[in-house]
């Protein structure tokens, strides 16, 4: 049976001033992104009302995001690395993984197509008390004969804590995040292609109160520090005028987490 795929393209991210995947997904029908903890502020995606563990996050159609990374991963994927996002809702998406009962979110990253570069910066404020700064950049380099190419991206995000009801405890915690990555390809022949990709994220977040003090000196604090390194390689071979294809791939991820 055919499967309905909803696509979130770059126009949606640009028109909504989204800087992360979590912000852009909020504008997709049947998908809700909510903050589940006012201390650590981790986001959770609900598809058709089902909780986050019932959804599968893919990168380039492959499940390389671990379950632990998926808890905070929605905010750790910057918009400037995304070409589009494909959302499949319903039980049919379970073909992509055992936990994809509610749906699947497939992130297609940018492929180097032409020589180009882009730099962006944004400042925002919530209720005049919580400032957020975002800076991002992209560079793409491609050979004249398209035999090889590489796309690099980098983003920086810094957000102050937000206290909506003035009780001294944050509703959104302090956030500082750096992300860097690349995607490259090489074509040994007209019918084969080698792909390499890598990205790293260094994130610090803290929620609670008394942010000017050490965590153990405050009334309540939840603090996490992530260092994530992940990458993958694939080999595609076509024959019979691109009607047939064999694809081999491998991926690895290392997560360092300090949770207080």
Task: Give short role names for the model-derived ranges.
Residues 159-179, 185-187, 191-245, 252-257:
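Flexible loop and strand-edge segments within Gram-negative outer membrane beta-barrel domains
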């Amino acid at each position: 049976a055919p499967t309905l795929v909803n696509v979130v393209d770059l126009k949606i991210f640009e028109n909504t001033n989204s800087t992360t995947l979590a912000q852009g997904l909020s504008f997709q029908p049947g998908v809700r992104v909510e903050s589940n903890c006012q201390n650590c502020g981790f986001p959770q995606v609900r598809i058709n009302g089902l909780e986050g563990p019932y959804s599968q996050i893919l990168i380039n159609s492959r499940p390389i995001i671990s379950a632990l990374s998926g808890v905070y991963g929605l905010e750790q994927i910057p918009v400037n690395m995304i070409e589009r996002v494909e959302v499949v809702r319903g039980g049919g998406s379970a073909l992509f993984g055992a936990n994809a009962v509610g749906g699947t979110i497939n992130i297609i990253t940018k492929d180097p197509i032409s020589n180009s570069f882009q730099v962006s910066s944004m400042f925002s404020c919530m209720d005049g008390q919580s400032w957020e700064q975002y800076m991002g950049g992209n560079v793409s380099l491609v050979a004249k004969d398209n035999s090889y190419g590489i796309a690099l991206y980098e983003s920086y995000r810094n957000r102050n804590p937000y206290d909506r009801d003035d009780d001294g405890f944050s509703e959104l915690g302090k956030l500082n995040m750096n992300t860097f990555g690349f995607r490259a390809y090489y074509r040994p022949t007209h019918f084969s292609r080698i792909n390499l990709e890598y990205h790293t994220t260094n994130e610090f977040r803290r929620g609670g109160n008394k942010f000017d003090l050490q965590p153990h000196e405050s009334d309540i604090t939840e603090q996490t520090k992530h260092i994530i390194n992940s990458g993958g390689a694939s080999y595609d071979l076509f024959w019979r005028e691109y009607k047939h294809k064999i694809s081999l791939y491998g991926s690895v991820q290392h997560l360092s987490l300090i949770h207080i």
